[in-house]
A protein has these predicted regions:
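ATP/NTP-dependent adenylation/nucleotidyl-transfer catalytic domains that generate, transfer
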Residues: 1-227
Length: 227
């Protein structure tokens, strides 16, 4: 059968993409869905990196659909649900129908499953754990080749596969992307602010040994420190 997977540029989805293409070849169609929520220049950059590895990636412009789904929403869980629904039911569901794909390769890792089951947070990429039958709901089966690995294990696989350090060592980035770093309503203008701030923070702290660093756009003024 034909399989499809969505590349986000993170180490998990990138490893799945390389493994999938080496196993399935032309039977795997890889897409990068630009949801308007990514880092600065990320869609084009990721497509170029995979092209150097001779892996074709189709760039899908779905920015208007995602921004429309998020309009007026301020609750974090409602925003996460809107992104999940738009991704799986609308954009990805449409692509699956167009390609006649019967399988979805997904970069779910062990930590995603544990956090969802424990109720720590709802992971956007966990379907069965949140009561969704993808075959019944969307028409495809989900394959999760990384579900027994944690992030450090995935990074080791990435290095073995020859993925560049900018992907293999990339700091964790949430599935709903910059939408999780905008407090309150997610608009195009507010996304642009946090996108520029994220770019600055990551460039300045990129050589540090910190596990995570990020920028958040608040809804109001916050306490500051003056020299």
């Amino acid at each position: 059968g034909v399989a499809i997977n969505a590349l986000s540029g993170g180490v998990d989805s990138s490893v799945v993409t390389v493994l999938g293409h080496r196993s399935l070849g032309d039977r795997l169609k890889t897409v990068f869905i630009d949801n308007a929520l990514m880092r600065k220049g990320e869609p084009e950059r990721v497509v170029k990196i995979l092209a150097k590895m001779r892996i074709p990636v189709q760039l899908i412009d779905a920015r208007a659909e995602f921004l429309g789904a998020l309009r007026g929403l301020t609750d974090p869980e409602e925003k996460r649900h809107a992104i999940t629904h738009t991704f799986y039911s609308k954009v990805f569901g449409r692509l699956v129908r167009e390609t006649d794909a019967t399988f979805l390769l997904h970069g779910t890792i062990l930590t995603d499953i544990e956090e969802t089951v424990a109720g720590i947070k709802r992971q956007h990429n966990i379907l069965a754990q949140v009561g969704i039958d993808p075959e019944k709901e969307y028409g495809y089966k989900v394959l999760e080749p990384l579900q027994t690995l944690r992030k450090d294990g995935v990074r080791k696989v990435a290095k073995i596969l020859g993925l560049p350090p900018e992907i293999a060592k990339r700091i964790p980035f949430p599935g709903p992307a910059l939408a999780t770093r905008v407090v309150g309503e997610v608009t195009e203008d507010r996304l642009e602010v946090v996108r520029e701030a994220t770019d600055i923070v990551e460039k300045e702290l990129g050589k540090s040994k910190a596990f995570q660093y990020l920028a958040v756009l608040l809804n109001d003024k916050a306490t500051g420190i003056r020299e």
